[in-house]
């Protein structure tokens, strides 16, 4: 049996999407084995990097697949890859037990469109499965309080790295 610490991390992207007021997009997860309770079901968009795909290309694809958003400009990115481990009980269920957690390349983007562009219930015109049941704009510093606890350290680092975009 493979030990959890011997498994690789799943390569992913994370996105801090800022509106003009400097708040970030948070989506409330529909479901998943990682849920603890409703107060920790909010997160920023994220997703896997396909084989041969560049991280920024994956970021734009994932953003569209989860929110229908295309109207963005890049503000910056975290230089390092940020990783988190899944709790043991979740690691066996998520991704068929192939990964110990995720390693993420984080990007900051400014949303330049109209909120009517955002569609989390039928993202991509219904071409993609909904991952969120609700969304809102909130303060970047609050995101770590609202995310599932095992992702909190990553969100705190993202907040430090991208704080300058929250007050433009």
From Swiss-Prot:
Alphabetized InterPro entries for the sequence: Nudix_hydrolase, NUDIX_hydrolase-like_dom_sf, NUDIX_hydrolase_dom, RppH
Superkingdom per UniProt: Bacteria
Gene3D superfamilies assigned: Nucleoside Triphosphate Pyrophosphohydrolase
Pfam families assigned: NUDIX
Record-annotated Nudix hydrolase domain positions: 8-160
UniProt-listed CDD domains: NUDIX_Ap4A_hydrolase_plant_like
EC number(s) stated in the UniProt entry for this protein: 3.6.1.-
Short motif Nudix box, span: 47-68
One term of GO molecular function: bis(5'-adenosyl)-pentaphosphatase activity
Record-annotated membrane-spanning stretches: none
GO biological process, alphabetically ordered: nucleoside phosphate metabolic process; ribose phosphate metabolic process
Obligatory cofactor(s): a divalent metal cation
PROSITE patterns (UniProt xref): NUDIX (PS51462)
UniProt entry keywords in alphabetical sequence: Hydrolase
UniProt family annotation: Belongs to the Nudix hydrolase family. RppH subfamily.
Purpose: Accelerates the degradation of transcripts by removing pyrophosphate from the 5'-end of triphosphorylated RNA, leading to a more labile monophosphorylated state that can stimulate subsequent ribonuclease cleavage.
Stated name of the protein: RNA pyrophosphohydrolase
């Amino acid at each position: 049996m493979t030990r959890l610490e011997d498994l690789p991390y799943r390569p992913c992207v994370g996105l801090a999407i800022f509106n003009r007021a400097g708040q970030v997009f948070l989506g409330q997860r529909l479901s998943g084995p990682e849920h603890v309770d409703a107060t920790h079901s909010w997160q920023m968009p994220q997703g896997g990097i396909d084989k041969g795909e560049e991280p920024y290309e994956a970021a734009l694809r994932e953003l569209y697949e989860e929110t229908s958003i295309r109207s963005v400009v890049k503000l910056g990115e975290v230089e390092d890859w940020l990783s988190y481990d899944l709790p043991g009980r979740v690691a066996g269920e998520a991704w068929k037990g192939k990964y110990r957690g995720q390693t993420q390349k984080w990007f900051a983007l400014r949303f330049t469109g109209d909120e009517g562009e955002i569609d989390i219930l039928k993202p991509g015109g219904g071409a993609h499965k909904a991952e969120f049941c609700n969304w809102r704009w909130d303060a970047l510093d609050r995101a770590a309080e609202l995310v599932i606890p095992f992702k909190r350290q990553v969100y705190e680092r993202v907040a430090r790295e991208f704080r300058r975009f929250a007050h433009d």
